[in-house]
Amino acid sequence: MASFATKFVIACFLFFSASAHNVLLPAYGRRCFFEDLSKGDELSISFQFGDRNPQSSSQLTGDFIIYGPERHEVLKTVRDTSHGEITLSAPYKGHFQYCFLNENTGIETKDVTFNIHGVVYVDLDDPNTNTLDSAVRKLSKLTREVKDEQSYIVIRERTHRNTAESTNDRVKWWSIFQLGVVIANSLFQIYYLRRFFEVTSLV
């Protein structure tokens, strides 16, 4: 029978893995969040930048940074990316901070959807690490990652659909413009030929 501590760890894992968030990023700003970790804890975060403007066809990007308990200590950095997944193994106990940045653009509709897949304590001295409980935790994490990835795919599909619709609109209006040019050119040629023959007949 699993010990109370093991059950508690599993419960914590399931709780954190269910945490899904969507936040609006301020123009030329950032949004930051905190996690209290013990040494050996693993913090896994996946994210997808998006646009709350339903008509947008641009794939927006941003930056992601994880800081240690000391604000100047940068542990993980990802620059100019549309999505990603970062895993950090806490080197020591402390108050860790992670931030999503929009500091290089004035876009006011940029948002980020992110999921915390789990804060899992790994006891390297536990001989039962590879037990059924461990397998259940891993399976739960993988299941959550698949579900989160599906939510990100929805965001990407919306962006790609808007891009396709925007391209179709441009092609449609360009075709109408070309048709108008052809009709105008044909009318001009008819008018010119009629005038030409009228002048010729008068001569």
From Swiss-Prot:
Membrane topology, Lumenal segments: 21-172
Keywords: Endoplasmic reticulum, ER-Golgi transport, Golgi apparatus, Membrane, Protein transport, Signal, Transmembrane, Transmembrane helix, Transport
Ranges facing Cytoplasmic side: 194-203
Biological process according to GO: endoplasmic reticulum to Golgi vesicle-mediated transport; Golgi organization; intracellular protein transport; protein retention in ER lumen; vesicle budding from membrane; vesicle organization
PROSITE patterns reported in the protein's UniProt record: GOLD
Record SMART domains: EMP24_GP25L
Compartmental location: Endoplasmic reticulum membrane; Golgi apparatus membrane
Protein name (Swiss-Prot/TrEMBL): Endosomal protein P24B
